Amino acid sequence: MSRSLVKRVAPYLAGRIRENHRLLNFSSASAIKEASSSSSSQPESSSNDVVHLSDNCIRRMKELQSSEPEKKMLRLGVETGGCSGFQYKFELDNRTNPDDRVFEKNGVKLVVDNVSYDLVKGATIDYEEELIRAAFVVAVNPSAVGGCSCKSSFMVKL
C-alpha cells in the first residue's frame, strides 16, 4: 500500500475513532444506551446504508448455529493490514457492544462496529467454498477499490 494512500485515509479514520471514543466515554450507561439507540433507530435511507447477507452466508450461519446451544452472530471488522492496506476480519460472537450496528436477515445477525461500518456500508457478505478454502468474504463493497485475489484485503475508495 502506498504511503500517500495511508496519509489520505489516516485523518478520516482518526476522526471516526475520536468520535466513537467520545461515545464510549459517556459517564452513564443510560447515555450510552440513548446515544446508540438514537443512531440505530434512524430509518435506513437506502440499500447502501445496509450491509447485506447473501443466501450462502445465511445458509452457512444457520448450519453453524444448529450445532451451538447459543445462537452466535457473525461479526465483521476492518483492520489495517493485508496486501492492500485494510483487511476484513470475521468472527462468531454472542455479544454486541454499544457502538455496534446489527443487521438481520432470516434470523441471522451480522454485527459491525461503527468504525468498520463506514468502510463496509452497502457491502454484501457471502460464504464461498473452494477447493483450497471455505470462508466468509465481502463479495461486493462499494467503499473499496482494488484488493487482492484472496478477497480478504482492500483499498479504500476516496
From Swiss-Prot:
Cofactor(s) essential for the protein: Fe cation
Superkingdom to which the source organism belongs: Eukaryota
Assigned GO CC terms: mitochondrion
Presequence positions on this chain: 1-26
Subcellular location: Mitochondrion
InterPro entries cross-referenced by the UniProt entry: FeS_biogenesis (IPR000361), FeS_cluster_insertion (IPR016092), HesB-like_dom_sf (IPR035903)
Record: residues binding Fe cation: C83, C148, C150
Protein's GO biological process: iron-sulfur cluster assembly
Cofactor binding: number and manner: Binds 2 iron ions per dimer. The dimer may bind additional iron ions.
Function: Involved in the assembly of mitochondrial iron-sulfur proteins. Probably involved in the binding of an intermediate of Fe/S cluster assembly.
UniProt xrefs under PANTHER family: IRON-SULFUR CLUSTER ASSEMBLY 2 HOMOLOG, MITOCHONDRIAL
Similarity field: Belongs to the HesB/IscA family.
Quaternary assembly: Homodimer; may form tetramers and higher multimers.
Annotated protein name in UniProt: Iron-sulfur assembly protein IscA-like 2, mitochondrial
Originating species: Arabidopsis thaliana (Mouse-ear cress)
